[in-house]
UniProtKB/Swiss-Prot annotation:
It comes from Homo sapiens (Human). One of its GO terms (biological process) is positive regulation of cell population proliferation. One of its GO terms (molecular function) is GTPase activator activity. This is TBC1 domain family member 8. Keywords: GTPase activation, Repeat. The gene is TBC1D8. The record marks 552 as: Arginine finger. Residues 1031-1070 are annotated as: Disordered. One of its GO terms (cellular component) is membrane. May act as a GTPase-activating protein for Rab family protein(s).
Amino acid sequence: MWLKPEEVLLKNALKLWVTQKSSCYFILQRRRGHGEGGGRLTGRLVGALDAVLDSNARVAPFRILLQVPGSQVYSPIACGATLEEINQHWDWLEQNLLHTLSVFDNKDDIASFVKGKVKALIAEETSSRLAEQEEEPEKFREALVKFEARFNFPEAEKLVTYYSCCCWKGRVPRQGWLYLSINHLCFYSFFLGKELKLVVPWVDIQKLERTSNVFLTDTIRITTQNKERDFSMFLNLDEVFKVMEQLADVTLRRLLDNEVFDLDPDLQEPSQITKRDLEARAQNEFFRAFFRLPRKEKLHAVVDCSLWTPFSRCHTTGRMFASDSYICFASREDGCCKIILPLREVVSIEKMEDTSLLPHPIIVSIRSKVAFQFIELRDRDSLVEALLARLKQVHANHPVHYDTSADDDMASLVFHSTSMCSDHRFGDLEMMSSQNSEESEKEKSPLMHPDALVTAFQQSGSQSPDSRMSREQIKISLWNDHFVEYGRTVCMFRTEKIRKLVAMGIPESLRGRLWLLFSDAVTDLASHPGYYGNLVEESLGKCCLVTEEIERDLHRSLPEHPAFQNETGIAALRRVLTAYAHRNPKIGYCQSMNILTSVLLLYTKEEEAFWLLVAVCERMLPDYFNHRVIGAQVDQSVFEELIKGHLPELAEHMNDLSALASVSLSWFLTLFLSIMPLESAVNVVDCFFYDGIKAIFQLGLAVLEANAEDLCSSKDDGQALMILSRFLDHIKNEDSPGPPVGSHHAFFSDDQEPYPVTDISDLIRDSYEKFGDQSVEQIEHLRYKHRIRVLQGHEDTTKQNVLRVVIPEVSILPEDLEELYDLFKREHMMSCYWEQPRPMASRHDPSRPYAEQYRIDARQFAHLFQLVSPWTCGAHTEILAERTFRLLDDNMDQLIEFKAFVSCLDIMYNGEMNEKIKLLYRLHIPPALTENDRDSQSPLRNPLLSTSRPLVFGKPNGDAVDYQKQLKQMIKDLAKEKDKTEKELPKMSQREFIQFCKTLYSMFHEDPEENDLYQAIATVTTLLLQIGEVGQRGSSSGSCSQECGEELRASAPSPEDSVFADTGKTPQDSQAFPEAAERDWTVSLEHILASLLTEQSLVNFFEKPLDMKSKLENAKINQYNLKTFEMSHQSQSELKLSNL
């Protein structure tokens, strides 16, 4: 590679470098000791010095120097790992610069010109290799060269970043370099002549954590299936851990969770991932989780600033977040103040004049005639310019038509109270295009229910109407006061005060609207007018597996509530669930969605319920609603760790917290709706829409804390489950205006003693007071940590189930079968790493049966066959692998699963001789052997085998053995014993038989009994050729049985004949085998097996025990080397073709 020119004195390097060639201005040198074998003492000393110091010259032992005539100062301008690489640079210099330099008179001009050219080349090379995105591109380029030379990965394996650190081997630290690439974690150490290389694929990492040991307080521990590795002594351990966490998460989800995982656009191409991309992704995910925004929202800028907060009459310090469609603000102090400004609501963004009190201010005005003042903004001009550009784009894509009549109507319906200003309507949130569009929408979807179901099916509570209304009015009054001070639209100030109001329970008349506000579903609703109605029409009447599942669960959704004892509620629920399944087929429909949607329909209109469901499924509970509920399982593991941290006594008593975590699955999936009375559970949903998943975590901890004493005294998991069920069933809501609606899993005790009742408001208040200290950032970090474990847990489950299915059907030892599965999966993964992107669904499909989830193609199978097959045939191995793949590919989809792969190996290693011969036989007839088979194409029309061999041979002791009688008797016996129920294999033609013999011949190569095997196969081949000729003549005359004996008796011994005739010579009677006659020549499996059984050496060869363990050990070592060699050879071939 090209180097940034730096001046050196050549006389100081005379002993270390040897000049290979030179010109007027350039010198090409080789590091002394490189390529000299074990020769000279000086070379060995320099090599030892480089090894001890881990010098760059060990990796790049060639360099080119710029020399200016008359100067003793030289400048290295290029280095290379090989002579070919450095010669390419030398040739470029000769062709492009050497003649140009001769026109310069001033030597300083020569140096400046060359250095400028080299720097331009470096910039171009840097741009192509993404190094310009690193903080120190020169050092990164050097590290990149070392990484490529030390680990010999294909070019597709891109280095992301590197760090100096120690890897602990027992109690001994090894100082070296940690290289983090897109698919692997690599460590290299070379000290005092001892080299250590460590390569760990990210997909093999089962645990990534920060730990402490006896020697060091802070280390990073990597846990794989078999080993633990500790890394320490980083300059910035926090940064390293975050990058490793991001890389592991991206790679694991890209390769193992492709069912629902969508990469950010910047990470779509793995080979383009850089450290900055990972940092941006982490910041993006925190931003979306903190403000609960759509997953496609991309963060553009984070700026420190201060916001004028009228309720506190001062400026509040914090940070502004600017994204595609939002301007958000969060105060430095957690919970103090937060705002979300959709750009759809923004009217203008203006710069104000700077003053000493208001430095660098801007004003953001929204449609409800409220302005937000930000000050102390760095780079204000560029920020405002970018915000205005995005504002213009949002308004162009989603024009807003404000309808005051609709707003007045909604404001009077929902908020019968005074407001901050006359135009500050809650109805702004609806953003209806116009009254005409609203009417046309109703005409378009006449079946859509116009109101929330709770208004049509209002129940009378046990309390008096006056008492119920008075409590509701008090809450409404408190909320109205809050709206006056903090705002009532989606752009309201969100403070600790509103959290307290939410914890008390939102009034029923405001509940649906505030859910829309807190989740920001109102923005989706306003941005997609008519979208839901179109979905309903498109999905109406369609029948599929998803609609059948929905129909099955419709009547299980809040059956106690009168709204869902009526076709009106059932029909609305059906439309919303079917429309969502039509919108998002990746999720489709999952159980528990029906319970959540039914509650949403109680308090919101049908279309609003749909957008709330979108918000919950796609951003508030990511990855919850899919076939494997990965997101819910991750949060269960997070919840388990939170129990250990906040309730240590309970965790100590219950050694296995997985039981509590499994009980909590329904808490997370249904937001407590399925295990708590409805009038209490809706208060939980209130908190969820305001605080997100944090509210569910802290409420779960509060439930366990309230029952900790009883749980500690419980004897088993069943009793603990009953304790929690009884407690949750007796949570009441004293402020609920409606009658109690029981939970789906109410617990009834035989005891007559009344169980104490817990008020939901008290429980929620306790959860905030005792467990409300968890931040979004902490929860996201825990999710990263546990997502690795959950995904690897799924992989382990898949592996165990595959082995459970396959073990009874094969004779391979379970531990060897496990090793084979790991090799099979690793082969699949390596193709995902370095080959061109292919549709992942055709490879790893979690919805398929366990044994068929990982599948490999013909090329991958050939690699594995070469590594683990006992039938090594030299150059013929690849051809045999192709035929084996075609045989195993029953459905002709060019993919095979693990079960088929193992069943084939089982026959090769553990099968009886007849099974092995049958497999070989099938490999040489269609479909395994095709007309286009590359090894079966021969320019000769005549057979390659002689058929004039005798049927009488001499034994070593001089006795003669007549095979005629034996052969005839064997054929008769086989005909009698043949299993009529088994499908008969087609007979083998002469061409196919020739290929069969070639395979046997190549299998015997380098065997200890090679000579005996060749003599035996010569005998067997002659027998079979004679049988084929007899059958051929018999078929032409119609009396095969009579002619068989005559033909055999007519055979004359001829010791000079060879089994494999010289292909360069054609027998004189070659014309006796025309094409038609060749087609008539056939032998059967029974003939081949009977003939092979006549030779003891062949029987011994096929029945000798084979060692699979040694093969597997070699395969584990060589699998990566074989793949990288093939990839590098392929890339070199492509390079040569491109040069041509």
